[in-house]
Amino acid sequence: MNDLLKGSLEFSRDRSNRSDIESGHGPGNSGDLGLSGFFKKVQEIEKQYEKLDKHLNKLQGAHEETKAVTKAPAMKSIKQRMERDVDEVGRISRFIKGKIEELDRENLENRTKPGCGKGTGVDRTRTATTIAVKKKFKDKISEFQTLRQNIQQEYREVVERRVFTVTGQRADEEAIDRLIETGDSEQIFQKAIREQGRGQIMDTLAEIQERHDAVRDLEKKLLDLQQVFLDMAVLVDAQGEMLDNIENMVSSAVDHVQSGNNQLTKAVKSQKSSRKWMCIAILILLIIIIITVISVLKPWTQKNGA
């Protein structure tokens, strides 16, 4: 997607310059078409994507740490770090969403400028680039949703291992589901508590409870991003279809123009050929007329009579 967006930007600038030249304007006037400020805003969004990547890497690293944690205080510390990162991800995502909506509004406003109407090169450039930005944003948010699913799945696996380690038995799915949902692990560990004493199992109970709270809170925060994801998905699908229609119309227009050019070329060649044969016919006719006149007049007989 990085390559797609960069390619779109480079293609857009090149196309803009060519449009300026064809319309009799110099490259320096490209800012008048609204592309200069447009590209600056796209680059600003790109910088925010880099921040999202950093926070995603931090969250993935922290999640890996939780797999080896067996003490509640350590789990709580990691949870707090992850919550700060997720809060920052939410803030950045809302900022990006606002900037993308701003691009959409400005794209519509820019169509009122001369030479920037709907379907023009400038308009297609802005539309294609904006869609690329949206697709990238959707992909970024999708990565956080994948992380949420991984956390949820691996949380279950960790709980199953903890139960087996303490009790020596594998709990059924219903018991694990209940523990995951409520965080109350005493019931599942009742036999172990009676046999080993509450004191020896308290650390495990506290760690499971802390892990439960961490997963619940992180999942809620990450689910808040789901609405942003859905909003972007709807916009990308709708505008993607619109862009396809524009490109199809442009492609069709190009085909018609090319076909017209071919027909014109054939007509010119045919006209030249017709002129050539007409000249030959006229020349032959002149020769026939000259021969006929000479045959009638017979100038050589007049010379003999004299």
UniProtKB/Swiss-Prot annotation:
Segments in the Vesicular topological domain: 298-306
Record key words, sorted: Acetylation, Coiled coil, Membrane, Protein transport, Transmembrane, Transmembrane helix, Transport
Domain of life, source organism = Eukaryota
Q: Name one GO cellular component term.
A: endomembrane system
Q: Which residues lie on this side of the membrane: Cytoplasmic?
A: 1-276
Membrane-crossing residue ranges in chain numbering: 277-297
InterPro entries named among the record's database cross-references: SNARE, Syntaxin, Syntaxin/epimorphin_CS, Syntaxin_N, T_SNARE_dom
Where are residues bearing N-acetylmethionine located in the sequence? Answer: 1
Q: Name one GO molecular function term.
A: SNAP receptor activity
Ranges in a coiled coil: 35-72, 134-162
Q: Which biological processes are named by the entry's GO terms?
A: exocytosis; intracellular protein transport; vesicle docking; vesicle fusion
* Occurrences of domain t-SNARE coiled-coil homology (ranges): 205-267
Bias-annotated ranges (Basic and acidic residues): 11-23
CDD domains from the entry?
Answer: SNARE_syntaxin1-like (cd15848), SynN (cd00179)
One Pfam family, short name: SNARE
Report residue spans for region: Disordered: 11-35
Give a yes or no for keyword Mitochondrion in this entry: no
PROSITE patterns associated with the record: SYNTAXIN (PS00914), T_SNARE (PS50192)
Membrane topology classification: Single-pass type IV membrane protein
Q: Where in the cell is it found?
A: Membrane
Please report which protein family the annotation says this sequence is part of.
Answer: Belongs to the syntaxin family.
Q: What does this protein do?
A: Vesicle trafficking protein that functions in the secretory pathway.
Please name the PANTHER family in this protein's record: SYNTAXIN, SYNTAXIN-131-RELATED
What is annotated about its quaternary structure and interactions? Part of the t-SNARE complex.
What's this protein's name?
A: Putative syntaxin-131
**Organism from which the protein derives:** Arabidopsis thaliana (Mouse-ear cress)
